[in-house]
Structure formats: C-alpha cells, structure tokens
C-alpha cells in the first residue's frame, strides 16, 4: 500500500503466483445474501467475468511468474511508485515475469507505454452480452 503525507492510503497492489488458489465461495454466498436481486445479478456477472479473464491470464503463465491481481491508485504517480516497489521485490525473489489483465474500462494504454507487452486480447464471452465490444487485454513485463 502507499500512504501519503496526509496519512491516507492512495494505492494498493495485490499479486499472486499462477498456481495460487483461493476459495471465495463462502464469502461470495454471504455477501450475495445481503444484496438485492439487481445487485446480485450484477455482482455475479462481474464475478464470472473476473473468473474468466483470470483463468485466461493464468493460462499464459508458468512457474516463476506472478500475476498482478488488484491495482488501485487514486493519486497521480502513486501507482507508478507502487508498481516499481513491487517489481523490485519480485526481482529480489528471482521471479521472471509479471502478468496482468485490464480492459477498456481502465487506462489500458498505460501498460505498453511502460514496458509491458500485449500477449492476449479478447472479447469476454461472459461480459459481451452486457457490454458488447468490451475488450480485455493481457500484458506481461520482464522483471
């Protein structure tokens, strides 16, 4: 995480190895029970989309590689600093590549401008019915 001079968190990064598994079914069941029908429908669509693109990203990966699973920044420059700190940590751990996925709702143009290579691009089978033409991009970068 990145904390500013004001003591507020301005960015967060999470990453995992390609073979990491997390069972979120109980959490998902609990959270869905608190939702309206409309919220539940939207939540399931987004969760299914994330499972789809995470799976496609992991298929591109091998041992010794890591996936950026969450990258949020609300202050200009904070994300770049967080990403560099993370890359330094991964280099220290002798990891080879960092993978991530992004889509047309994000600033996906950032990644090729900062040394990432596009390794996949596709229209989501899950999300296309909700947002036709919604494109997902998979990038990788050497560590």
Name each model-derived stretch.
Residues 79, 83, 104-109, 123-130:
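Short glycine/proline-centered loop/turn elements that form peptide/ligand docking sites
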Residues 3-5, 140-143:
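Active-site beta-strand termini and strand-to-loop segments that position acidic
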Residues 14, 19-70, 74, 126-132:
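Conserved acyl-donor/pantetheine-binding loop and adjacent beta-alpha core of acyl/acetyltransferases
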Residues 99-101, 117-135:
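Conserved catalytic-core motifs of GNAT/GCN5-like acyltransferases
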Residues 75-90, 113:
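Conserved acetyl-CoA-binding loop-helix of GNAT-fold acetyltransferases
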Residues 110-112, 116:
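Conserved active-site tyrosine of GNAT-family acetyltransferases
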Residues 62-67, 90-103:
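Conserved GNAT acetyl-CoA-binding A-motif
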């Amino acid at each position: 995480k990145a904390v500013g001079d004001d003591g507020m968190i301005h960015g967060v990064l999470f990453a995992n190895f390609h073979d990491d598994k997390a069972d979120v079914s109980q959490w998902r069941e609990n959270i869905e029970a608190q939702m309206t029908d409309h919220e539940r429908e939207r939540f399931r669509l987004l969760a299914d989309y994330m499972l789809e693109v995470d799976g496609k990203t992991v298929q591109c990966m091998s041992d010794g590689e890591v996936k950026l699973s969450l990258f949020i920044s609300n202050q200009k420059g904070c994300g770049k600093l967080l990403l560099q700190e993370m890359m330094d940590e991964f280099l220290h751990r002798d990891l080879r590549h960092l993978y991530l996925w992004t889509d047309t709702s994000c600033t996906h143009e950032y990644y090729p401008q900062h040394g990432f290579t596009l390794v996949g691009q596709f229209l989501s089978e899950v999300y296309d019915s909700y947002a036709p033409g919604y494109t997902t991009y998979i990038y990788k970068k050497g560590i």
